[in-house]
Structures are given as structure tokens and as C-alpha cells.
Regions:
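Active-site SXXK
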Residues: 58, 71-98, 123, 184, ...
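Mid-domain, small-residue-enriched loop/turn segments at the edges of structured enzyme/sensor domains
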Residues: 111-120, 134-193
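N-terminal secretory signal peptides that target proteins for export/translocation
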Residues: 1-21
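Short N-terminal segments immediately surrounding and downstream of signal-peptide cleavage
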Residues: 43-62
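Flexible glycine/proline-enriched surface loops and loop-helix/loop-strand junctions
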Residues: 63-69, 116-117, 125-132, 163-173, ...
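Short, well-structured active-site flanking segments
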Residues: 88-105, 198-203
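Structured C-terminal helix/loop/strand segments within mature extracytoplasmic catalytic/sensor domains
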Residues: 47, 56, 67-71, 137-140, ...
């Protein structure tokens, strides 16, 4: 299946890179360094990790923060993996099927947006937790665990157990499943380079429903936010919330993958995931560094 014209392919063709404009590269590098050295708005939010890497080579363009190797809950960023599973297994068929109805008793802490009939595109856009649960139930525990293992996704621990959100009921939501930002980068590169053990249709549909929008300088961004907190019982602590934004950005033959993780030290009105997304997207022009301008990871 071919992607529609409005959703360009996010992976680079095997072609030579354009000539590097040294002055532009140095200016962009300076901007990126300044951006990564600055914490998100608000003294009560910490940047645990920001990584940007070339999708084709894996070369790290920038790395900052002391939490890049530390595993935490993936929260709703795991929907990218769930999308690949669902489309590969045939549980999901296209961006608008299946449409599942909201039923009394489903999690609805996301408000009215979660109390609507939901299809895969709406699920990803509004991060509808109960749709994830319905997907994993249709996969079944064995297939769900097998996919997670084969994806090499963090600790791949989605084993069933006691608790409201154990196993396929929500292991990714402050549960047993954990992943580090560096592991997110490896997983995202496998998506961009299409090396995961799933069908072309699964890649194409996941690409379609994760599209964010076009950014300055012609970059096309795909990604997913996530908001959760420490612990393994699915309970949310607003005063210590994690905020993720992970994904990939492409322009022409170049693609980068990114993972940005923050943590709050006090409650906020706007979710940590949305704030992580906005902070990362604001710096996207600086992420458009040519490969020759790459820098080693900051330690």
C-alpha cells in the first residue's frame, strides 16, 4: 500500500547528503546546544534526557541529561508499538477501522474526548487508554508479549499479575514495562529503517496516524507524547509526572529520531507530555543539523 501524498515517507533514501553549509551548520549547532542546556519552562520541571540521532547511521547528534540510560514507564509513547502490533496482526485495519464504542466502566480520565466512538486515528490523537486495552485484549497475552519481546522494547516485561493495570491491561502505564530514552531511540530507528518484524501495512498505517504536522524548514514530524509517573501500580502522581515526546522527523533524504523526557517536581495544569512535545518542537529548526555537524554525546 502506498502512502497518501499528504503523508511523505519518513525514512531516508540511500542517496548522498547535500553539500554542507558550514556557517549554517555552526549556527544551528550553537542554537541546539543552547536549547539542550536550557531546562523546560518552570523551575519545577527537570529535563531527564534529550537525544537526537541520525536515523540512518544511528550517530548521536545531541545527547543531554543524566537519565538517558535509566528505564522508566513508557506511558502513552507505547501506543506507537501497539499500533505496529495491531496493524500487523489485523486487529486494526486502517486509520479509521475498527471503530469501537465507549462503554460504561471504561477508563475515562481523559474527559469527553475518551467517551466517544474511537478509531485508530482518534485513538492516537487523543491518547485513548481504553482503546489500547481493547487492542491488547484482542491480541491476547501471548501475542502481546511476543511482539514486545521481538521489538526489543525496553525490559519487555508485560507479564500478567495482580493490579488493575498489570499485563495487557496496562503494563505500559506506570506498570512493569520500562524503557530508557536510548532504547526509545533504537526502537524508533527500527521503525524508520523498517527492520522490525511487522508488515509493510503496519509501518504505513503507523506512519499515517502518528503524523504531527509540518514544521519550519520543511520538516515532517511523527511522534507520540506520554504522561505518567513513578511507581508500578498504575496510579498517577501529578507532583512527580514524567513527560515524554518521542518520534522521528524527515526532510528530503534526511531523517532524525528523537526522545525527550522531563519530570515535574510539582503539579502542573498542562500535562507533562504536552509540555515535552512543545519544548522539543520549538527547537526543531536546530535539529536540522547536517550529518557533518554532528557532535558526540554529552556525558
Amino acid at each position: 500500500m502506498m502512502l497518501p501524498s499528504h503523508s511523505p515517507r519518513p525514512w531516508p533514501a540511500r542517496a548522498g547528503l547535500p553539500r554542507v553549509d558550514t556557517a549554517r551548520a555552526l549556527a544551528a549547532l550553537t542554537l541546539l546546544a543552547a536549547a539542550l542546556a536550557s531546562p523546560p519552562a518552570g523551575a519545577d520541571t527537570r529535563t531527564l534526557c534529550t537525544i537526537v540521532a541520525d536515523a540512518a547511521s544511528g550517530r548521536v547528534l545531541a545527547e543531554r541529561g543524566e537519565g538517558c540510560a535509566t528505564r522508566v514507564t513508557p506511558a502513552s509513547t507505547f501506543k506507537i508499538a501497539l499500533s505496529l502490533m495491531g496493524f500487523d496482526a489485523g486487529v486494526l485495519t486502517d486509520a479509521h477501522a475498527p471503530v469501537l464504542p465507549f462503554r460504561a466502566g471504561y477508563p475515562d480520565w481523559g474527559g469527553d474526548a475518551w467517551r466517544q466512538p474511537t478509531d485508530p486515528a482518534r485513538w492516537m490523537r487523543y491518547s485513548v487508554f481504553w482503546y489500547s486495552q481493547q487492542l491488547t485484549q484482542r491480541l491476547g497475552q501471548a501475542r502481546f508479549a511476543s511482539y514486545t519481546q521481538r521489538f526489543g522494547y525496553g525490559n519487555a516485561d508485560v507479564a500478567p499479575g495482580p493490579g488493575e493495570f498489570a499485563g495487557m491491561k496496562g503494563a505500559w502505564n506506570s506498570g512493569s514495562l520500562r524503557i530508557a530514552p536510548r532504547e526509545q531511540i533504537a526502537f524508533l530507528r527500527a521503525i524508520v529503517n523498517r527492520t522490525l518484524p511487522v508488515s509493510a501495512h503496519a509501518f504505513e498505517m503507523t506512519d499515517r496516524i502518528t503524523l504531527i504536522d509540518a514544521q519550519p524548514d520543511g520538516w515532517i514530524v511523527h511522534g507520540k507524547t506520554g504522561t505518567s509517573s513513578p511507581g508500578d501500580d498504575g496510579r498517577f502522581d501529578r507532583a512527580r509526572a514524567y513527560g515524554w515526546f518521542v518520534g522521528w522527523a524527515a526532510r528530503g533524504t534526511r531523517a532524525v529520531v528523537f526522545a525527550h523526557l522531563i519530570q515535574d517536581d510539582a503539579p502542573h495544569d498542562v500535562s507533562a507530555g504536552l509540555r515535552a512535545r512543545d519544548a522539543l518542537l520549538a527547537e526543531l529548526p536546530a535539529l536540522a543539523l547536517p550529518a557533518a555537524g554532528a557532535v558526540p554525546p554529552a556525558r
